[in-house]
C-alpha cells in the first residue's frame, strides 16, 4: 500500500531472485506410490507450476527448474525438468498400467487407487494454496490427493507410511553456497532426509 509513496525520482527500485523455493520431496520408501517412476513423472507433469506462480503468487516468482535459482552458477537453467502437460502425464500413467477401470476419475493399478498423501504445513501461507492447486490439476489426470496441512509436519514426516509427497518452502542457499542444501536435505544422514 505504501509503494505509490516511493514512485518518484528520489527512489530506485531493483530486485533479485532469492533462493527461496517451494518444492516437493517424494517418498521412496516401500509402500509409497512414489516408488513408481511413472507416478513421479506424472506428478511433475501434472502440476501447473506456471499457473501457481501467476495466479496464486500473483507473478512474484517463477517456476524453478531445480533446487537453485536460475541466476546461480550451480543450478537453475542448467537443470531441466518436466513442464506442465496434463495429456502427456495421462499417457505416462496409461503406459505404466494406471487406468481408471471403474469410471470414478481416479486411476488404479493392481487394485490400488492412485492416491497420494500430500503433507505440508500452514506457516508458509503459500503451501496450502500449492496443495489445493496441485490437488485440482492432479485430479484432472486421475490422481487423488489427500492433503494433510499440519503444524505437526516435523513429527508426521518421520512416519514413512503417513506421506507420499512433502511440500516445503526453504531458502536453498542462504549463504550463497549450495552445500547447505545438500547437507540438510540430500545426504543419507541429513536432518531433513
Describe the function of each predicted region:
Residues 1-5, 144-146, 151:
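Ligand-site clamp/hinge motif
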Residues 35-136:
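Append "and occasionally in soluble cytosolic enzymes with long acidic Gly/Pro-rich linkers
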Residues 1-2, 49, 68, 169-173:
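Beta->alpha turn/N-cap motifs
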Amino acid at each position: 500500500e505504501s509503494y505509490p509513496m516511493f514512485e518518484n525520482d528520489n527512489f530506485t527500485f531493483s530486485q533479485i531472485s532469492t533462493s527461496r523455493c517451494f518444492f516437493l520431496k517424494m517418498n521412496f520408501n516401500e509402500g509409497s506410490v512414489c516408488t513408481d517412476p511413472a507416478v513421479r513423472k506424472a506428478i511433475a507433469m501434472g502440476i501447473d507450476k506456471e499457473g501457481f506462480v501467476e495466479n496464486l503468487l500473483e507473478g512474484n516468482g517463477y517456476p524453478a527448474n531445480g533446487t537453485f535459482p536460475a541466476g546461480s552458477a550451480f543450478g537453475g537453467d542448467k537443470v531441466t525438468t518436466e513442464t506442465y502437460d496434463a495429456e502427456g502425464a495421462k499417457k505416462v500413467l496409461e503406459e505404466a498400467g494406471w487406468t481408471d477401470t471403474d469410471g470414478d476419475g481416479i486411476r488404479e493399478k493392481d487394485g490400488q487407487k492412485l492416491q497420494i498423501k500430500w503433507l505440508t504445513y500452514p506457516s508458509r501461507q503459500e503451501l496450502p494454496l500449492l496443495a489445493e492447486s496441485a490437488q485440482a490439476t492432479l485430479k484432472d489426470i486421475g490422481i487423488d490427493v489427500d492433503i494433510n496441512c499440519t503444524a505437526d509436519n516435523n513429527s508426521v514426516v518421520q512416519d514413512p507410511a503417513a506421506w507420499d509427497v512433502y511440500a516445503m518452502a526453504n531458502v536453498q542457499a542462504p549463504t550463497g553456497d549450495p552445500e547447505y542444501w545438500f547437507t540438510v536435505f540430500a545426504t543419507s544422514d541429513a536432518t531433513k532426509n
